[in-house]
């Protein structure tokens, strides 16, 4: 099977309705991967910061916006929330990078993903979170399978 390749950057999301491989590289950012096995459709977001503070544009740069928009985009192509499962990746803290208020940005990004997915009743079936190393992930859209490779600090 031939897969279309799609790379997403921070503040982006993508839902694949055709067989695709969606890729991104993460440091303290988090990616939420959603999969609907009935529709065989997947989507991924990549967010930089946990919460939009209602100042400026409500961008998918923020976890609370990015996760909601990803769920909405999946529903827009026919997926049902009750059929979605999630996989979470990222949230690293290389050398305590980006400490705010005593908590690292990566940790806050992880917390918001858990909170929103729990609130939306979307089960988290796999995760690789935290630590000090970045990650490159590749999501096969029609199977929901995620391949993960740890990367060196210089790669993200």
From Swiss-Prot:
Keywords: Chemotaxis, Hydrolase. It comes from the Bacteria. It catalyses: L-glutaminyl-[protein] + H2O = L-glutamyl-[protein] + NH4(+). Belongs to the CheD family. Probably deamidates glutamine residues to glutamate on methyl-accepting chemotaxis receptors (MCPs), playing an important role in chemotaxis. This is Probable chemoreceptor glutamine deamidase CheD. InterPro entries: CheD-like_sf (IPR038592), Chemorcpt_Glu_NH3ase_CheD (IPR005659), Cytotoxic_necrot_fac-like_cat (IPR011324). It is an enzyme of class 3 (hydrolase). One of its GO terms (molecular function) is protein-glutamine glutaminase activity. CDD domains: CheD. Its EC number is 3.5.1.44. The keyword Coiled coil does not apply. The keyword Hydrolase applies. One of its GO terms (biological process) is chemotaxis.
